[in-house]
Amino acid sequence: MPQLDTSTWLIMILSMILTLFITFQLKVSKHYFPTNPEPKHTPLLKNSAPWEEKWTKIYSPLSLPLQ
């Protein structure tokens, strides 16, 4: 059986990595990135829940009078 020639694998792998790096660099450089991003100002809406309008007293067992 003939031996597999692996002498060119290093050059192929390095050239592939270099090509991928250059390709991704070119793709990323074409994107627009804002220089100073600021958060959007959205109006704060207060959700009205029925339990927020009522006052309820919670009785704990320790605050009850002794019998």
UniProtKB/Swiss-Prot annotation:
Q: State the superkingdom.
A: Eukaryota
A matching Pfam family: ATP-synt_8
One GO term (biological process): proton motive force-driven ATP synthesis
Disulphide bridges in this chain? none
Q: Its membrane topology, per UniProt?
A: Single-pass membrane protein
Where are the N6-acetyllysine modifications?
K54, K57
List modified residues, type N6-succinyllysine: K54
**Transmembrane portions of the chain:** 8-24
User: Keyword Acetylation, does the record have it?
Assistant: yes
Q: Which UniProt keywords apply?
A: Acetylation, ATP synthesis, CF(0), Hydrogen ion transport, Ion transport, Membrane, Mitochondrion, Transmembrane, Transmembrane helix, Transport
Q: Where in the cell is it found?
A: Mitochondrion membrane
Q: Which GO terms describe its cellular component?
A: mitochondrial membrane; proton-transporting ATP synthase complex
Q: Cite the InterPro entries for this sequence.
A: ATP8_mammal, ATP8_metazoa
Q: A single Gene Ontology molecular function, please?
A: proton transmembrane transporter activity
Q: Which family does it belong to?
A: Belongs to the ATPase protein 8 family.
Q: What does this protein do?
A: Subunit 8, of the mitochondrial membrane ATP synthase complex (F(1)F(0) ATP synthase or Complex V) that produces ATP from ADP in the presence of a proton gradient across the membrane which is generated by electron transport complexes of the respiratory chain. ATP synthase complex consist of a soluble F(1) head domain - the catalytic core - and a membrane F(1) domain - the membrane proton channel. These two domains are linked by a central stalk rotating inside the F(1) region and a stationary peripheral stalk.
Q: What does the subunit comment say?
A: Component of the ATP synthase complex composed at least of ATP5F1A/subunit alpha, ATP5F1B/subunit beta, ATP5MC1/subunit c (homooctomer), MT-ATP6/subunit a, MT-ATP8/subunit 8, ATP5ME/subunit e, ATP5MF/subunit f, ATP5MG/subunit g, ATP5MK/subunit k, ATP5MJ/subunit j, ATP5F1C/subunit gamma, ATP5F1D/subunit delta, ATP5F1E/subunit epsilon, ATP5PF/subunit F6, ATP5PB/subunit b, ATP5PD/subunit d, ATP5PO/subunit OSCP.
Q: What is this protein called?
A: ATP synthase F(0) complex subunit 8
Lineage of the organism? Eukaryota, Metazoa, Chordata, Craniata, Vertebrata
